[in-house]
Structure formats: structure tokens, C-alpha cells
């Protein structure tokens, strides 16, 4: 199945049902009181995480989703039926972003989580609501409010513990093939990896973690060069980043400049991502002598001002990969989980969260006969008082 990690859809919550003007009619009761019921609320639109899904491809074919409208009220003080909600099932790790405001409306990072993305309209009021001591035959009602309409960009963010980044052909896919059962395509030309892939690394039975391999970055990626920074979003939930550096590039480029390019693109994309724990991994050390490898590594470390630990590996013959995986597993075991979790969700303002204000909408009056005068004392007949 084709991997689709982004889709644009339009959702519309149901409109609220209208209130109704009605009066009680019964045998021998010529002037019954008001009994117009309220309308029903419109249905809401939700997204829900489903672990059985792994792509957003379905939302490329159908792009409009609408919840049910609330029923109008009816006589006998009958309230209209509430509109049915609609739930859109998405892969775990999906977030919904409002295209016009760039606001994150919803984010579902665990199976079964359900979040509202569009709120249904508020119901209209029937004429019973307007009855008072001075208005015993009200002909006023209110219409239901419109349901919320949003244009959303659905983004699928892969859930992984370790994210890999580097230039094309740095050896990221070769590494993930060496340490897991994943088999991403490997070749000697740039951008062999066109879509993200995941691999599960099992160090010992009770210790395992997930590694994400994304397409390589090049200079100018933040401005759209190459595959751009589209796939960097998949690293946002990773706990550790592995910066893979090729010490013997096939295009004979400078490893120092290559390392600086990746860091620059990372900082341009997101300060939060740039501040995540990051390890340097120097790959292809088997292609040069040990002295030459150490010299190149030292140049890179000096240029970056790197003071943390680093690793030397050869992914193709698995030299140093086992030690790296063990240290990654130990590090993540000690890393506080709070640093990995998404920050507490901000409150999203929906259209009709302020119900009291919705009631202050336009009031419609129906005047087609003299029903509103049946309680007028002046119509009770002409009475003459005589003082004796």
C-alpha cells in the first residue's frame, strides 16, 4: 500500500435544528398555551486513532465529511433529535492542523484516543422559551446556528524512539537494515529512501526500541530543495536523534561541511527539534585507515564544538553497531519519559463553546393572526362600574 503521510480535508459539523412556534390545541380548549419545542444540536466531527491503520491514503480520495443536522423542534414541547456525530479514523500519531490559522486542532498519539475537530451548531429555541407573565402567547423563536466548518491538514507523525538524520547516502538505511528486520532500499545513488521507514531493534528480550529512517536532507532543504523538510516532522516525537555522518562521501564532499549543513537545516526547521538529545555517529570507518578516520572525526568535532560522546561504526559490516544499540537502549531507559511526551494540549476554541451568547441570536416573530391578543384584558368585553 502506498504510504501517504499528509492529506487535506474539509469537515462540516451539523447545523442546529430550528425552534418552532406552536400552541396547544385540544377539544374544548380554544386558546391553549405555547408548546413549541427547541431544535436539536448539530452533530460534531471527531478524529479517532486506530492502530490498524498506517496511512492517510483514504483521505486523498474523499475530502469532504459532514455530520448530521439537528432536527427542528415540534409541538407538544417536543425537542428535535440531536444530529449524529461523525468519527474519522486515522493512524496513531496523526494530528489535525487548521489550514487557515495553522492551529493544531487535535493530536491523537495513542490507540482509541478521540478528539473533536468541529463542533455542531447550537439548537434554536421554541416559543415556549419566550413565555412570561406579560407575554403569554409568544410568537418568537430562534433558528439553529450553523455547524462549524474547518479545512484541515492531516499529518501523520511516525512514533519512534530513535530518529536518524543525515545527508543522502550517509548510510542511514544500511544501518537500520543491520540492526533490525526492516529492509529499506539501499543503492549507491542519492535519495534511495523516498518515504520514512521503521525498524524495531531488540537488544535483549526485555529491551527494544523503534528506529525511524527518513529521506536524506541537503543544503537548502528548509527552502524546499531536494525532498525539502517535509519528512522532518516524523522526528518530532523521537526521544533521541542519531546524526549519521559519512566520513568518506561518495561525491568527495567535505564531511565537516556536511555535518554543519544538517545542523543548520535542523535549526531552521524547529528549535525544539534541534534541542533534542543528539548523538554523532560516524559511518564507513572501514573505508579509510584508523588514523585517517580519527583525523576526519576530530575535524568534525572541533567544527561543531562537540563535547558529548560519539560513535564510530561501519553499518555495512556491522562494526560497532551492537555497542551503539546497547548504549541507546540504556540511555532511553534512564531518559525521563516526560521529555518525550507531547506537551499538554492547549484548549481549542470551537465556534459554539459560548452557548449563552448563541441564545442571543436573531429572534424571529410569526404574526399571521390575533393569537397573541388572546390574553389581552382589553378584549374581555366592555365593563361598566356603577357606584350606588
From Swiss-Prot:
GO cellular component, as recorded: cytoplasm
EC number: 3.6.5.-
Family: Belongs to the TRAFAC class OBG-HflX-like GTPase superfamily. OBG GTPase family.
Ranges of residues in domain Obg: 1-159
InterPro entries referenced in this protein's UniProt entry, alphabetically: G_OBG, GTP-bd, GTP-bd_Obg/CgtA, GTP1-OBG_CS, GTP1_OBG_dom, GTP1_OBG_dom_sf, OBG_GTPase, P-loop_NTPase
GN (gene name): obg
Residues that coordinate or bind GTP: 166-173, 191-195, 213-216, 283-286, 314-316
Protein name from the UniProt record: GTPase Obg
OBG-type G domain sequence ranges: 160-333
GO biological process: ribosome biogenesis
GO molecular function: GTP binding; GTPase activity; magnesium ion binding
Subunit structure: Monomer.
Compartments reported by the entry: Cytoplasm
Amino acid at each position: 500500500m502506498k504510504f501517504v503521510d499528509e492529506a487535506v480535508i474539509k469537515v462540516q459539523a451539523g447545523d442546529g435544528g430550528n425552534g418552532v412556534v406552536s400552541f396547544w390545541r385540544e377539544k374544548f380548549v380554544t386558546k391553549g398555551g405555547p408548546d413549541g419545542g427547541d431544535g436539536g444540536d448539530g452533530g460534531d466531527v471527531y478524529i479517532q486513532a486506530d492502530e490498524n491503520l498506517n496511512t492517510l491514503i483514504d483521505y486523498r480520495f474523499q475530502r469532504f465529511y459532514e455530520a448530521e443536522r439537528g432536527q427542528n423542534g415540534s409541538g407538544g414541547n417536543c425537542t428535535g433529535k440531536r444530529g449524529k456525530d461523525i468519527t474519522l479514523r486515522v493512524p496513531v500519531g496523526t494530528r489535525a492542523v487548521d489550514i487557515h490559522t495553522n492551529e493544531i486542532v487535535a493530536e491523537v498519539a495513542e490507540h482509541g484516543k478521540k478528539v473533536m475537530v468541529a463542533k455542531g451548531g447550537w439548537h434554536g429555541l421554541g416559543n415556549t422559551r419566550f413565555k412570561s407573565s406579560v407575554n403569554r402567547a409568544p410568537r418568537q423563536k430562534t433558528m439553529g446556528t450553523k455547524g462549524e466548518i474547518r479545512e484541515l491538514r492531516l499529518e501523520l507523525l511516525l512514533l519512534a524512539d530513535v530518529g536518524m538524520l543525515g545527508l543522502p547516502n550517509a548510510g542511514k538505511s544500511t544501518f537500520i537494515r543491520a540492526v533490525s528486520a526492516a529492509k529499506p532500499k539501499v543503492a549507491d545513488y542519492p535519495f534511495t529512501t523516498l518515504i520514512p521507514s521503521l525498524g524495531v531493534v531488540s537488544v535483549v528480550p526485555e529491551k527494544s526500541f523503534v528506529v525511524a529512517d527518513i529521506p536524506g536532507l541537503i543544503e537548502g532543504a528548509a527552502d524546499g530543495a531536494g525532498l525539502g523538510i517535509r519528512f522532518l516532522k516524523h522526528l518530532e516525537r523521537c526521544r533521541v536523534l542519531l546524526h549519521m555522518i559519512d566520513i568518506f562521501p561518495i561525491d568527495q564532499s567535505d564531511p565537516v561541511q556536511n555535518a554543519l549543513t544538517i545542523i543548520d537545516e535542523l535549526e531552521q526547521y524547529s528549535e525544539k527539534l534541534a534541542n533534542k538529545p543528539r548523538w554523532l555517529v560516524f559511518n564507513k570507518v572501514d573505508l579509510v585507515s584508523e588514523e585517517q578516520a580519527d583525523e576526519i572525526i576530530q575535524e568534525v568535532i572541533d567544527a561543531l564544538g562537540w563535547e558529548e560522546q560519539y560513535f564510530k561504526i561501519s553499518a555495512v559490516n556491522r562494526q560497532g553497531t551492537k555497542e551503539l544499540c546497547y548504549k541507546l537502549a540504556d540511555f532511553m531507559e534512564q531518559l525521563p519519559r516526560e521529555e518525550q511526551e507531547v506537551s499538554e494540549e492547549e484548549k481549542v476554541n470551537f465556534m459554539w463553546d459560548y452557548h449563552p451568547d448563541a441564545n442571543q441570536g436573531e429572534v424571529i416573530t410569526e404574526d399571521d393572526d390575533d393569537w397573541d391578543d388572546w390574553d389581552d384584558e382589553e378584549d374581555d368585553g366592555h365593563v361598566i362600574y356603577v357606584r350606588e
